[in-house]
A protein has these predicted regions:
Chain B
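ABC-family P-loop ATPase nucleotide-binding domain
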Residues: 1-23, 233-248
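ABC family nucleotide-binding domain
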Residues: 10-226, 231
Length: 426, 248
C-alpha cells in the first residue's frame, strides 16, 4: 500500500516533468479536451438553465393547485369529444367555495375563478398589444405567489366591487412607463381607464412559457363588465378568451383525494347524472410536467451526446500523444524495468500522465466555460444560466475518466514491453 | 599468470546456472543464442564475461540480470528458482538483488542525480526520508556528494557513470552487473570507473563485468569466455599491481 503511494507520487512527478518539458505538445493535446469540456459544460449549464426556467414557469402554476378546464393539459387525439363540452363558467368558483365551506375536513381551501383575453394597453404614446389580460378575485394571491415590486395586488373590496384597478407585469410596466412609476397612473385597456395599483417583480420569460412579466390582472367583476367573455366566445375570429377555475389544495401530499373531492363537486355543479362521463378536466402541474419532461430529457440526452463527441475527439488526441510518449521513452521504460519497476508501476505511470493532461484540459475548459457562462448571463439576462458546483465536480470526474480511458491502451502496451527489447531500443 | 590464488575467501553461491539454453525465433529461423551454459558465481567474486559479438554474451547477461528467462536449464539466484518466475517476481529480484550499470548510463535525463539514485528505492517501497538518506550516501560513496542536485546534462560522462553506479549500489544488491561500463568513456575516465569498481570489490561487493575489451576484463579476478553460445574457458586471473595497491 505504502509502496503504491510512493509509486503514485513518483508517477505524478514524472507526469508533471513530462508536461513541462513538452509544453507545446501538452497544451495542444490538452486543447482537444479543453474544447470538449467547454462544450459539455456549456451544454450542462444550458440544460440546468432549461430545468430552472422550466421549474420557474411551473412554479407559476403551483404544485398545490388544481385547474378545472374545458380541455385537458395534454395532447388529445379525440379532440371532437372535448370541443363541444360546456364552457367552464367563473360562477362555478362560488359554487365550489360554498360546498367547501359546508364540507368539514375538506381537502380544498379556496376556488378562484379566472378569465383571460388578449388586449392592448395604452399609456400616453406607448402601447403594448396582445397582453394577457386576466380577470380574477383577490383570492388569486392564495393560488399563485405574486411578488409586487411596487404597489400591491387588489384587495377583497376592490375585487367584489369590480373596481377599475389593474396590476401590471414587469415587462408591461417597462414599456408603458419607461421613466416614471406606474403607480396611480391610469392606463387604457380597450378604451377603458384602469388605475395601476401594483407592478409585479421580474420573473423572467423562458422558451415562451407563461410568465407574469407580460400580463395584467384586474378584478373579475370589472373584467366581465368591459370584456364580456360570453359575447367574445361567440364571435368568430375574435381573440378567443377562456375561463377556468383554480382550486387551492390544503395538503399537496393528498392531491389525489383533493382531485376526487373536486371532481364530485364539479359533477354536482354541472348536474351530471352518475352514469354520465365528466365533461370537464381537472389538471395539475404534474400533468403539464409529464408532457414536457420527455421533450426536455430528449434535448438533454441529444445535447450531451453531441457535445460528448467533441470530448471523444479530445480523448483520441490524448491517446495518440500517450502512444507517442510510450514510443519515445521505450528505453526509459526498459531502464525502469531493470531497476525493478513492475508492470503495474509502468501502467500507472502512463495512466497518470494521460490523466494529468486531461485534468489540465478539464481545468482550463472549466475556467473558460465559467467565463463564457458569465458573459452569456450578462448578455442575455433572461436566460437562466446555471453554473453549479456539481457541474465542476462532474466535469472533473469526466476529465479523469477520459484520461484513464484514453491512456489505458498505450499504458497497457508500455507495461507489457519486454525489458530486454526496451533496453535495446534506440 | 603465476600466482593463481583467490584474493580472499569466497562467500556462498549467489548464482547457480546449469545447462541453460536460449532460443530466439527470428522469422523462420531459430537462433540458438545459448547452447547449454553452466556457471556458478559466489559472493565477493569479481567476474568478467568476455566474448566476440554473437557469442551469446548479451543473452547470458540478460539471463544473469533476470531481464529474461532461459528456454531450458536451471537458474537459481540465492537458492530461488528464477527460470520459472513471472514478470513481476523478476522485477522484484532485479530491484533487490541486482544493480545494473549500463554502457549508455541510462539515467533519466530530467531528474537530478539524487532522484535517479532514489528510483530503485521507490520501487522497493521505501519511505522518502530513508530514500533521501541512502541515495545521498550512495552518491557520496562514489565521490559525487557535491553533485546530488545536478541533472545528467550538467555532468561529465564519467560522473554520469558514477551516478549510475550509485544507483546500482543503493539498494545493496547481491550482484552488480556492469555491461560495458567504460564503452562510452575515454580511456582515462574508463580507468577511473574501473578503479571505482575495484574499490567496490574491495568493499565486499560482487561484480559481474560484461565486456569485449581484454584490458578491461583484466581487472576481474575470474574471466569467462563465451563462443557460439557455450563457455569456451573459465579461468581465474590475477593482477599483481592491483593486489599491491589493494594491500597497501
Amino acid at each position: 500500500m505504502k509502496r503504491f503511494l510512493y509509486e503514485l507520487e513518483e508517477s505524478w512527478r514524472i507526469a508533471y516533468a513530462q508536461m513541462r518539458s513538452n509544453m507545446t505538445r501538452s497544451i495542444l493535446t490538452a486543447l482537444g479536451v479543453v474544447i470538449g469540456i467547454v462544450a459539455v459544460t456549456l451544454m450542462g449549464t444550458a440544460i440546468g438553465g432549461i430545468q430552472v426556467g422550466f421549474d420557474k414557469s411551473m412554479a407559476v402554476l403551483g404544485d398545490d393547485v388544481l385547474y378545472v378546464t374545458q380541455w385537458p393539459w395534454k395532447a388529445v387525439d379525440d379532440w371532437w369529444n372535448y370541443r363541444d363540452r360546456k364552457k367552464i363558467q367563473t360562477e362555478y368558483a362560488e359554487t365550489i367555495n360554498r360546498i367547501i365551506a359546508a364540507t368539514p375536513n375538506s381537502n380544498l381551501v379556496v376556488a378562484v375563478p379566472t378569465s383571460s383575453l388578449m388586449r392592448s394597453i395604452k399609456y400616453g404614446g406607448n402601447e403594448v398589444e396582445n397582453v394577457f389580460t386576466l380577470g380574477t378575485t383577490s383570492d388569486f394571491t392564495v393560488t399563485s405567489t405574486i411578488d409586487c415590486k411596487e404597489g400591491r395586488f387588489f384587495n377583497e373590496i376592490e375585487s367584489r366591487s369590480g373596481a377599475q384597478v389593474v396590476v401590471i407585469g414587469y415587462d408591461v410596466a417597462d414599456v408603458l412607463f419607461p421613466s416614471e412609476s406606474p403607480i396611480d397612473k391610469s392606463v387604457l385597456i380597450s378604451g377603458h381607464l384602469f388605475k395601476v395599483i401594483g407592478v409585479n417583480a421580474r420573473q423572467g420569460t423562458f422558451l415562451g412559457l407563461f410568465s407574469w412579466d407580460s400580463m395584467v390582472a384586474m378584478p373579475l367583476a370589472a373584467f366581465n363588465k368591459y370584456f364580456n367573455l360570453k359575447n367574445q366566445l361567440d364571435v368568430p375570429g375574435q381573440n378567443q378568451g377562456e375561463s377556468d377555475v383554480r382550486v387551492k389544495v390544503k395538503d399537496k401530499t393528498k392531491l389525489a383525494e383533493a382531485k376526487d373531492e373536486l371532481t364530485g363537486i364539479m359533477r354536482r355543479a354541472r348536474g351530471l347524472l352518475p352514469e354520465k362521463k365528466e365533461d370537464f378536466s381537472i389538471n395539475e402541474q404534474q400533468a403539464f410536467k409529464s408532457t414536457l419532461d420527455p421533450v426536455k430529457n430528449t434535448i438533454a440526452i441529444a445535447g450531451l451526446f453531441i457535445t460528448g463527441l467533441s470530448l471523444f475527439v479530445g480523448a483520441i488526441g490524448i491517446m495518440n500523444i500517450t502512444f507517442v510518449s510510450v514510443k519515445e521513452r521505450t528505453k526509459e521504460i526498459g531502464t525502469r524495468k531493470a531497476l525493478g519497476a513492475r508492470r503495474r508501476t509502468i501502467l500507472l505511470q502512463f495512466l497518470i500522465e494521460s490523466t494529468a493532461l486531461c485534468l489540465l484540459g478539464g481545468f482550463i475548459g472549466l475556467t473558460v466555460a465559467y467565463f463564457m457562462c458569465f458573459g452569456i448571463g450578462k448578455a442575455f439576462p433572461s436566460f437562466p444560466i446555471q453554473f453549479s458546483f456539481g457541474l465542476v465536480i462532474a466535469s472533473m470526474i469526466v476529465s479523469v475518466l477520459t484520461g484513464l480511458m484514453s491512456g489505458f491502451a498505450p499504458a497497457w502496451s508500455a507495461s507489457r514491453l519486454d525489458p530486454v527489447t526496451a533496453l535495446r531500443y534506440e | 599468470m603465476d600466482a593463481r590464488q583467490p584474493v580472499r575467501q569466497l562467500g556462498p553461491v549467489v548464482i547457480d546456472i546449469e545447462n541453460i539454453t536460449k532460443d530466439y525465433v527470428m522469422g523462420e529461423e531459430i537462433v540458438r543464442a545459448l547452447r547449454g551454459v553452466s556457471l556458478q558465481i559466489r559472493r565477493n567474486e569479481y567476474l568478467a564475461v568476455m566474448g566476440p559479438s554473437g557469442s551469446g554474451k548479451s543473452t547470458l547477461m540478460n539471463m544473469l540480470g533476470c531481464l529474461d528467462t532461459p528456454t531450458s536449464g536451471r537458474y537459481e539466484f540465492n537458492g530461488r528458482n528464477v527460470a520459472e518466475m513471472d514478470d513481476d517476481e523478476l522485477a522484484a529480484i532485479r530491484n533487490r538483488e541486482i544493480g545494473f550499470v549500463f554502457q549508455t548510463f541510462n539515467l533519466l535525463p530530467r531528474a537530478t542525480s539524487l532522484r535517479n539514485v532514489e528510483l530503485p528505492l521507490i520501487y522497493a517501497g521505501m519511505d522518502p526520508e530513508t530514500r533521501m538518506e541512502r541515495a545521498t550516501q550512495a552518491l557520496t560513496d562514489v565521490g559525487l556528494g557535491d553533485r546530488i542536485q545536478h541533472k545528467p546534462n550538467e555532468l561529465s560522462g564519467g560522473q554520469r557513470q558514477r551516478v549510475a553506479i550509485a544507483r546500482a549500489l543503493v539498494n545493496n544488491p547481491s550482484i552488480i552487473l556492469a555491461d560495458e561500463p567504460t564503452g562510452n568513456l575515454d580511456s582515462k575516465t574508463g580507468e577511473e570507473i574501473m578503479a571505482l569498481l575495484e574499490d567496490l570489490y574491495q568493499r565486499n561487493h560482487t561484480i559481474i563485468l560484461v565486456t569485449h575489451e581484454r584490458d578491461i576484463a583484466a581487472h576481474a579476478r575470474r574471466t569467462i569466455r563465451l563462443r557460439d553460445g557455450v563457455v569456451e574457458s573459465d579461468e581465474s586471473t590475477f593482477v599483481p599491481q592491483l593486489e599491491t595497491v589493494a594491500a597497501s
